[in-house]
Amino acid sequence: MQADFVIIGSGSAGSALAYRLSEGGKNSVIVIEAGGSDFGPFIQMPAALAWPMSMKRYNWGYLSEPEANLNNRRITAPRGKVIGGSSSINGMVYVRGHAEDFNRWEELGASGWAYADVLPYFKRMEHSHGGEEGWRGTDGPLHVQRGGFTNPLFQAFVEAGKQAGFETTEDYNGSKQEGFGLMEQTIFGGRRWSAANAYLKPALKRDNVKIVYGLAQRIVIEDGRATGVEIERNGRIEVVKANREVIVSASSFNSPKLLMLSGIGPGQHLQDMGIAVKADRPGVGANLQDHMEFYFQQVSTKPVSLYSWLPWFWQGVAGAQWLLSRGGLGASNQFEACAFLRSAPGLKQPDIQYHFLPVAISYDGKAAAKSHGFQVHVGYNLSKSRGSVSLRSADPKADPVLRFNYMSHAEDWEKFRHCVRLTREIFGQSAFHDYRGPEIQPGEGVQSDEEIDAFLREHLESAYHPCGTCRMGAKDDPMAVVDPQTRVIGIDGLRVADSSIFPHVTYGNLNGPSIMTGEKAADHILGKQPLARSNQEPWINPRAAVSDR
């Protein structure tokens, strides 16, 4: 088997790459995917979002090493093992990120990836339904919508934000990237609109695109050039030959793992694993970043939450309605209100993110209390804590070693304490007067710094936004893995394009910027002139120096 371009991974970036590299029919593309089909309601029905993440069929099922600052808990670290990758098992929340995120990328050496550079690619990929005119794309492959916003608890949340003195925004993916407002979703026609549905399946209708199901073992490197990929398929080892380039889009865990298995990474670590060093790049696997969050939960005194739909019978009713009409509760992820807030005056951008949910549930999807309730997922999104990905052994089937070092920076504790107290202030506004019952979690007895810290150690979880482990930077940066054209430094014919190349975590969910990365990388790979830089300037809060807390 051979193709001009061989892409490892059919996730958010990999699917976009397959679509763009194969346009026009000139170039042949093979996509290697370790997982399988996304057929069925567990993935396609938006309200079933908790299911695929808990199923080994769709999820690599990784765990972190014991986290010292979180009571030595091993934190779940899911990644999609299915066409569409993590876009097929995620929460379907669409966030581009803040303009400052991408300007920071350029400051860190990713020349040509500032906000003005990436905004045209966000527009190219989007088919926005109801976004801000002039700031959003309207004919791209990725459908982005807003929910019905019919539950009164959503409206109470946004109104409470206004009462607390915060901004509101009509479109946080438009010019005003701060405040309370409606959440955007990658849902279309009542279905999850994953990267597979948006990009990969249309690409596979072309004669020049093929998907091969198998586990990538290593990249074949000959005389300093990547020439193919060794895969295991149906119990046999095969080589997929790349006539032009190999592109790794296997996730922030598996992209560095695959590079290291191929001899690209920290030299001493590779030698310890018995792997011949092809390129000593100490940045491979370093710089692991993520978002953390916790659930803040409140009893609702009125029966307006989704609690009534949690019993199996009513879940079945919702599922049947969705199967028949692609409508009803099954057609929404139920994340329809959100907020992006600054935790202190003087900050250039928001650093706290809220997802509001009109039900109080635990991480396994079960009711947190035997009553109606509501909750927010809240987290500090600009942590300075950094971790790493390394090899457990030279066996391609062995899980990578994930050390996040969560909460290893003193500022993290300060910011998360602030999240607890700020959420109490928001839920304490008069907008929630008709709904606010007792606090379920953290609990009204959790007040002091020490009590809050104890709660956080036991209840903080990953928001599932890992990135940064094959960092993009200047060619002379010893910790950079790829240059701003996404080429692996030191090896010809090899690129990485996914969230692993992010120099710094973006503020918000990562599916959107990961797809953008695939879109932009495709132009670099094809030698095209990048899309013209945007001259649009995002809104700046005129009260930024004195407002918020």
UniProtKB/Swiss-Prot annotation:
The keyword Oxidoreductase applies. It is an enzyme of class 1 (oxidoreductase). Keywords: FAD, Flavoprotein, NAD, Oxidoreductase. Its EC number is 1.1.99.1, 1.2.1.8. It holds the Pfam family GMC_oxred_N. FAD binds at residues 4-33. Pathway: Amine and polyamine biosynthesis; betaine biosynthesis via choline pathway; betaine aldehyde from choline (cytochrome c reductase route): step 1/1. The active site is at 465 (proton acceptor). It catalyses: choline + A = betaine aldehyde + AH2; betaine aldehyde + NAD(+) + H2O = glycine betaine + NADH + 2 H(+). Its cofactor is FAD. GO terms for molecular function: betaine-aldehyde dehydrogenase (NAD+) activity; choline dehydrogenase activity; flavin adenine dinucleotide binding. Disulfide bonds: none annotated. InterPro entries: BetA, FAD/NAD-bd_sf, GMC_OxRdtase, GMC_OxRdtase_N, GMC_OxRtase_C. The keyword Disulfide bond does not apply. One of its GO terms (biological process) is glycine betaine biosynthetic process from choline. Involved in the biosynthesis of the osmoprotectant glycine betaine. Catalyzes the oxidation of choline to betaine aldehyde and betaine aldehyde to glycine betaine at the same rate. Belongs to the GMC oxidoreductase family. This is Oxygen-dependent choline dehydrogenase. It comes from Rhizobium johnstonii (strain DSM 114642 / LMG 32736 / 3841) (Rhizobium leguminosarum bv. viciae). The lineage of its organism: Bacteria, Pseudomonadati, Pseudomonadota, Alphaproteobacteria, Hyphomicrobiales.
